[in-house]
Design a protein with these regions (language model features):
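AlphaC helix of the protein kinase catalytic domain
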Residues: 58-67
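Activation segment signature within eukaryotic-like protein kinase domains
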Residues: 75-76
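C-terminal regulatory tails of eukaryotic serine/threonine kinases
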Residues: 216-286
Length: 286
């Protein structure tokens, strides 16, 4: 298991409640990190989630530079399934990036860190706010316009570029002004050796106008890059990953037991324990 510990303040309680609510809505998705329990003490909240020991996609990219095209296809398809699950429930992630995409012990992906996610988002009920990680923000976010779930498809495009080319198509170092100018005004640049189908996919994910972005005007599953993907098998996690984490899996029976004291500022409706977590605790106590 993994434990996310967040200090509790009155001003941020609604944000913590929102994250808990979104994690519960995402419980049935095999491509999103599962919440086992949410607890609170006097001054902190605890999100207890599954431990994803395969590492992050970001770490893999740093180690490899770029990934084999079949790996890119497989990971992109699973990420797309996770995003579609969220979007069908009117949830926008807002921070899709390689470091927020983990691998489980079998090699399947999990989207993590829903702390910036927002629910209740539709094309007629947009949100605002410059939120996320600069290199992965969509133009409409940087221009401080209202936006919807289309921003996640843009971010996916940047992630795919990192996987396939080992770089961003808008890379301009760490100078914020230049990065913003490139994303909002310039066209993406790809290396000449980039796979033609990947390039075609990226050109449609990285459209400046949200309504013209693949994933918005058309289902991403129909793109030719995914012609070899059996989406029904993939959604059931019956597709065999091309990479399986080789780290030794050790059973850790050291559990965190929270102090039994009443929170100073209790958040009604926050505490939660999933049935699977209850069963796990029973097995450990035997």
């Amino acid at each position: 298991m993994a434990i996310k510990i967040v200090n509790k303040t009155r001003s941020e309680q609604h944000i913590l409640m929102r994250e808990q609510r979104i994690l519960l809505k995402a419980q049935d998705c095999p491509f999103i990190c599962h919440l086992y329990a949410a607890q609170q003490s006097a001054d902190r909240v605890y999100f207890i989630t599954e431990y994803l020991l395969g590492g992050s996609l970001g770490a893999m990219i740093k180690m490899c530079g770029s990934l084999d095209i079949n790996h890119v296809r497989f990971y992109t398809a699973e990420i797309a399934c996770g995003l579609q699950f969220l979007h069908q429930r009117y949830i926008v992630h807002r921070d899709i990036k390689p470091d927020n995409i983990m691998l489980d012990r079998s090699g399947h992906i999990r989207l993590i860190d829903l702390g910036l996610a927002q629910d209740g988002v539709t094309s007629s009920n947009k949100i605002s706010g410059v939120t996320g990680t600069l290199q992965f923000m969509a133009p409409e976010v940087l221009l401080e316009e209202d936006y919807d779930t289309a921003v996640d498809w843009w971010s996916l495009g940047i992630v795919v570029s990192w996987m396939a080319a080992g770089q961003s198509p808008f890379y301009h170092g760490s100078i914020r002004r230049k990065v913003i100018k490139a994303i909002t005004r310039k066209e993406p640049k790809f290396p000449p050796w980039l796979d033609a189908d990947v390039k075609h996919l990226l050109e449609r994910l990285l459209r400046k106008k949200p309504e013209e972005r693949l994933g918005v005007y058309r289902n991403i599953r129909g793109h030719r890059f995914f012609d070899t993907i059996d989406w029904e098998v993939l959604e059931l996690k019956r597709s065999r990953p091309l990479f399986k984490p080789f780290k030794e899996i050790l059973e850790n029976r050291n559990m965190l037991w929270l102090e039994d004291k009443t929170p100073l500022h209790p958040m009604d409706g926050f505490s939660y324990t999933s049935p699977s977590w209850t069963r796990m605790l029973r097995r450990i106590r035997l």
